[in-house]
Swiss-Prot record:
Database matches in Gene3D superfamilies: NAD(P)-binding Rossmann-like Domain, ProC C-terminal domain-like
Class of enzymatic activity (EC top level): oxidoreductase
Protein name: Pyrroline-5-carboxylate reductase 2
Organism the protein comes from: Bacillus subtilis (strain 168)
Entry superkingdom: Bacteria
NCBIfam families: proC
Keyword Cytoplasm: yes
Keywords: Amino-acid biosynthesis, Cytoplasm, NADP, Oxidoreductase, Proline biosynthesis
């Protein structure tokens, strides 16, 4: 595996470092990390993972083949300005939400190979559903290397960049909607008489079991739903209540609004990049 440099050392960078090292595709000494000013964080990651903190930009970029942009999106202009002179022919992988490939290339001032990635927070346990898109400058080997790296934190799916707003809505923000559903289930369980701990255990196992049924059976969710819905039974009564409450419409509206907001943020960053370099 090529040597990897993380510019930014937050939670997503740590999740990726953890996944990469657990997978065994590279060694700790082949991972370099840097950030803007937080030395304590770099020391923490060094002590935890035995990776290499590096403040010397020339050394950092001379020794790395893949650069992962993992700082906060709002810091993109300043951060990319500070590293632009050191980027040669490395592959750039961006986990910066809202920044398109074109915007990133605009900040760098040239058409370099860029992989734009949308992971989710389950990367922390190597269960991320990650969508990624590639620039036309990325080679076949670049794509293979990026996919191998991303698969250390979960599943990785190559999509056209125009679909990344949808990926953001479904996968990027998706865990929050699952957690919100579980919150509602916990409240409902307590309302019908269960204590909080019992409710939580039952709900989490039900969610895990239902997901595994979908993955292992190969059946469509509609078929599995119908298999446990008896005419005049308890499940039918509950599903009717969901329908009366416009459950499906609420979910669709949620996803549409998330995708819409993702597109708006994308345009804001693009506009800021053009204004900065006009």
């Amino acid at each position: 595996m090529k040597k990897i440099g993380f510019v930014g050392a937050g939670s997503m960078a740590e999740a990726m470092i953890n996944g990469i090292l657990q997978s065994g595709i590279t060694k700790p000494e082949h991972i370099y990390i840097t950030n803007r000013s937080n030395d304590e964080r770099l020391i923490e990651l060094k002590e935890t993972y035995s990776v290499r903190p590096c403040r010397d930009k020339n050394e950092f970029f001379t020794h790395t083949d893949i650069i992962i942009l993992a700082f906060k999106p709002k810091d993109a202009a300043e951060s990319i300005d500070s590293i632009r002179p050191y980027i040669k022919d490395q592959l750039v992988i961006s986990v910066l939400a809202g920044l398109t490939i074109e915007t990133i290339q605009h900040y760098f001032g040239r058409k370099l190979a860029v992989i734009r990635v949308m992971p989710n927070t389950s990367a922390a346990i190597r269960k991320s559903a990650t969508g990624f898109s590639v620039s036309t400058e990325a080679s076949k080997n670049d794509i293979i290397a990026a996919k191998a790296l991303l698969e250390t934190i979960g599943d990785a799916t190559l999509v056209e960049e125009r679909h990344l707003d949808a990926v953001t809505a479904i996968a990027g923000s998706g865990p929050a909607y699952v957690y919100r559903y579980i919150e509602a289930m916990e409240k409902a369980a307590q309302k019908v008489g269960l204590d909080k701990e019992t409710a939580k255990a039952l709900i989490l196992q039900t969610m895990a079991g239902a997901t595994d049924m979908l993955l292992q059976s190969g059946k469509q969710p509609e078929k599995l739903r119908k298999e446990i819905t008896s005419p005049g039974g308890t499940t039918e009564a509950g599903l009717r209540a969901l329908q009366d409450s416009r459950f499906e419409e609420a979910i669709i509206h949620c996803i549409e609004e998330t995708a819409k907001r993702s597109a708006e943020i994308k345009e804001q960053f693009a506009g800021a990049a053009l204004e900065r370099h006009s």
